[in-house]
């Protein structure tokens, strides 16, 4: 991203602006300051950094930029430009006037949707976009020097952990969250939908809500977006939005604790919890209204439009689920580029559990075990999404990356080489131990036969986990998931046997 910014700064382009946008704490301001710090003394003397405020207008910006141009300034960095309510509808001022006059204009902000809308209208074909929302594990590890997948899950692809002050009204109140420049950066991960609402409210005087206006007017747009984000399957189906809201994390963990193999960890704690009260508490934390409070029905059109805006924010990517049936259509599988939102919701769930009377009456050990198990379940599912997403982004056009489901069971990930007609199959486990149950699907002859029928010979069977690399006698390769993610930029998936070397990982 940084080199793209410098390329723009020192190019001969004279009619385009550079847009640096993404969610909060993804390095936008740091990138701008780094670019300024690397300037020559001469260029620095002609550079200005402006921090926009909510009270600023494009008329004020126009006046100031004229003065700066007359004073000899040619490099203008404007941070948080999307805070100005009339930015989207007047953004062409930057490209058509000041960039055309020879100024290099760099605009940055957290409202990604605002930039997306501006690029479709005012800045169409006149902007060089630089996206910062998605920070892959390898980049996070390089920048912060922390080689821990759990830390990455906690930070969720940003350079800051999720908001934990769930009971702090000053933090959660909308007016407090945006009361100044710094508090704007504190808006809660679980309320990311406010990004959408702010941009749409500013665009064409709020006239572009389309079919979502009824939800927005009734105060239920936040509910609809959050239901999509929380759903464990990440599917945009009407049933997800209209069913009574329940915590999928809580239901799954209760089931797993009942069937825990270790008798010391087996417990029915969650069966005795007042789940209705817990769910109500969680909904309050996430600003979600239940079905009984929902006055506006959710339609397919609502779902499509919400999905479109979440995609524009770069929050979601579709990684389809394939099935063993060659004639069946792939199933939509939405991955979030910011896993921290999911983890933040799980933390909110644990926080609400601690307030439940039944749970509070238990021993500290029981509370710790239960809370830890909930977060372990969440981290496991998030790890699968992270590996799928980053592998898919690293693969070239000759390779497809997807999850493969069968009538019973699934492969967490398949990498299919369309050119060579061969594949590699993976299980992804949030564990540091090697357990036969982890790779049982990889050795299931029926599943493997069905896979090879559709996707050619299986050239490798892998378990990505948090332990050390090792190859078992049965041919299953265990590989450290953190090293796997760090190696992804050099993805060169090809049959290792053809290279005449021993295969210890997906020839990467």
For each predicted feature, which ranges?
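N-terminal pre-Walker A segment at the start of P-loop NTPase domains
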Residues: 1-9
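Conserved lysine of the Walker
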Residues: 28-29
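Conserved P-loop NTPase "ATPase switch" module shared by AAA+ and STAND
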Residues: 69-91
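Sensor-1/coupling segment of RecA-like P-loop NTPase cores
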Residues: 97-119
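Interdomain motor-coupling "hinge/lid" segment immediately C-terminal to the ATP-binding subdomain
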Residues: 117-268
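Accessory nucleic acid-recognition modules appended to NTPase machines
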Residues: 196-411
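Conserved catalytic cores of phosphodiester-cleaving nucleases, focusing on short active-site segments
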Residues: 391, 411-436, 461
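Domain-level recognition of nuclease-like catalytic cores that cleave nucleotide substrates
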Residues: 459-508
């Amino acid at each position: 991203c940084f080199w793209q910014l410098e390329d723009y700064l020192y190019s001969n382009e004279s009619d385009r602006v550079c847009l640096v946008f993404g969610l909060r704490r993804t390095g936008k301001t740091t990138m701008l300051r780094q670019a300024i710090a690397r300037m020559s003394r001469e260029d620095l003397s002609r550079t200005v950094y402006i921090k926009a405020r909510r009270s600023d207008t494009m008329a004020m910006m126009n006046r100031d930029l004229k003065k700066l141009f007359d004073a000899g300034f040619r490099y203008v960095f404007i941070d948080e430009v999307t805070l100005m309510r009339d930015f989207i509808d007047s953004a062409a001022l930057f490209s058509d006037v000041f960039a055309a006059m020879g100024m290099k204009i760099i605009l940055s902000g957290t409202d990604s949707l605002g930039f997306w809308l501006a690029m479709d209208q005012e800045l169409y074909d006149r902007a060089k976009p630089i996206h910062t929302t998605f920070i892959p594990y390898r980049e996070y590890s390089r920048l912060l020097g922390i080689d821990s997948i759990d830390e990455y899950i906690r930070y969720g692809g940003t350079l800051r952990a999720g908001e934990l002050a769930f009971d702090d009204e000053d933090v959660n109140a909308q007016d407090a969250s945006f009361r100044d420049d710094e508090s704007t950066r504190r808006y809660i991960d679980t309320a990311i939908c406010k990004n959408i609402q702010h941009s749409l409210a500013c665009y064409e005087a709020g006239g572009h809500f389309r079919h979502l206006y009824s939800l927005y007017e009734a105060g239920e747009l936040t509910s609809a977006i959050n239901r999509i984000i929380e759903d464990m399957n990440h599917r945009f189906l009407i049933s997800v939005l209209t069913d009574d809201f329940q915590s999928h994390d809580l239901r799954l963990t209760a089931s797993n604790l009942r069937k825990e193999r270790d008798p010391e960890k087996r417990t029915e704690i969650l069966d005795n919890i007042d789940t209705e009260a817990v769910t109500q508490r969680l909904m309050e934390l996430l600003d979600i209204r239940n079905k009984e409070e929902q006055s506006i029905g959710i339609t397919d059109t609502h779902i499509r439009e919400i999905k479109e805006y979440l995609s524009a924010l770069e929050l979601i990517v579709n990684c389809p689920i394939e099935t063993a049936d060659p004639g069946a259509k792939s199933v939509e599988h939405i991955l979030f580029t910011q896993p921290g939102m999911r983890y933040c919701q799980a933390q909110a769930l644990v926080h609400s559990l601690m307030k439940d009377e039944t749970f509070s009456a238990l021993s500290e050990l029981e509370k710790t075990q239960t809370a830890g198990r909930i977060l372990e379940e969440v981290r496991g599912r998030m790890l699968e999404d992270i590996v799928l997403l980053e592998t898919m982004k690293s693969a070239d056009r000759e390779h497809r990356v997807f999850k493969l489901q069968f009538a019973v069971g699934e492969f967490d990930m398949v990498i299919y080489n369309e050119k060579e007609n061969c594949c590699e199959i993976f299980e992804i486990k949030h564990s540091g131990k090697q357990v036969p149950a982890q790779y049982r699907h990889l050795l299931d002859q029926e599943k493997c036969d069905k896979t090879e029928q559709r996707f050619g010979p299986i050239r490798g069977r892998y378990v990505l986990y948090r332990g050390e690399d090792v190859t078992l006698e049965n041919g299953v390769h265990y590989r450290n998931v953190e090293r796997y993610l760090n190696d992804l930029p050099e993805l060169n998936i090809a049959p290792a046997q053809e290279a005449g070397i021993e295969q210890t990982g997906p020839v990467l």
